[in-house]
Each structure stands twice: as C-alpha cells, then as structure tokens.
C-alpha cells in the first residue's frame, strides 16, 4: 500500500476513512501513515490553462453544481465535453445552467450504451424510474456535449453515434 493517497476534502471525514481501512484490512491498518495537507481551492474560471481543455470528468460527490457554477465563463468560452454522475439532488440546478448550450446524453459503461436524453427521460430520472430495461438506477453517467460541436466530428470519432 505504498503511495496510497486518500483525498479528505470531500464528503467523508478522516475518521470514516480510517474506520473503513480498519474494517477492510484489520491486520494492516497500522501500516498506514496519515498526513494532513492544506490546499488552496480555486474556481475553475480563475485558473490559466496553457492548452485547450476539451474533456472534463467531474466527480465531486454531489457537489457538481458548485463546480459547474465556478466554471461558467470557462464553459462559455471553451465548450468542453464533460461527464458527471447523475445525482438527483442537484441535477436540475446543473441542467438549468447547461441546457441552452449543451445536449445531455446518458451513458451506462457496463453496457456500452449511449442515449440522448429527452424531456421524458429527465422526468423519469427525477422520479427515480429506470429509463428502460437497458439502464440501471445505480450507475447513471451523463455526458454533456456542446450543441455547436459538429455531428460529423462525433461520428468520425467512433465514440458516440
């Protein structure tokens, strides 16, 4: 377990993580060393980038709407594709900010399915219903693809259509 890094700036407390390690590795948990580091947090919009960013994966345990709020200028200027996990508690706030410039696609990794979401799908998601027999409620990933991205490009990429 060398160089294992656990990020504590999330929804889990340090004690929660330590107890998980104790339970899962009772004979080895004393070998773990714990460090405390402080990091400066910056809004995405305040960071200078040397290269154009075209894809972003956001995984912040339900705080996606805050990340997206802090990157409004970046999204407007760069229009990257990005991926988030569906979270019912903040999805409407996210969609409200993005629907003007983005399409939303549902992707289920274990089935390799990719499906554009329409209003009826959003309603089903928000009501906790399975969209259809090919999609589970457990692992719903959402791709946001800029409306101005050429479909020709997407077709040629081999990933989406």
Which residues does each PLM region occupy?
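Phosphate/nucleotide-binding beta-alpha loop and adjacent structural elements of enzyme active sites
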Residues: 1-161
């Amino acid at each position: 377990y060398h160089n294992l890094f656990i990020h504590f700036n999330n929804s889990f407390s340090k004690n929660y993580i330590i107890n998980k390690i104790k339970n899962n590795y009772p004979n080895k948990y004393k070998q773990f060393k714990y460090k405390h580091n402080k990091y400066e947090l910056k809004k995405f919009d305040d960071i200078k980038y040397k290269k154009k960013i075209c894809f972003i994966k956001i995984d912040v345990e339900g705080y996606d709407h805050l990340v997206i709020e802090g990157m409004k200028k970046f999204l407007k200027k760069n229009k990257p594709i990005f991926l988030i996990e569906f979270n019912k508690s903040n999805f409407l706030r996210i969609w409200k900010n993005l629907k003007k410039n983005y399409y939303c696609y549902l992707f289920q990794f274990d089935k390799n399915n990719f499906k554009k979401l329409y209003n009826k799908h959003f309603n089903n998601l928000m009501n906790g219903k399975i969209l259809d027999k090919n999609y589970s409620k457990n692992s719903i990933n959402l791709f946001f693809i800029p409306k101005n991205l050429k479909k020709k490009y997407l077709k040629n990429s081999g990933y989406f259509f």
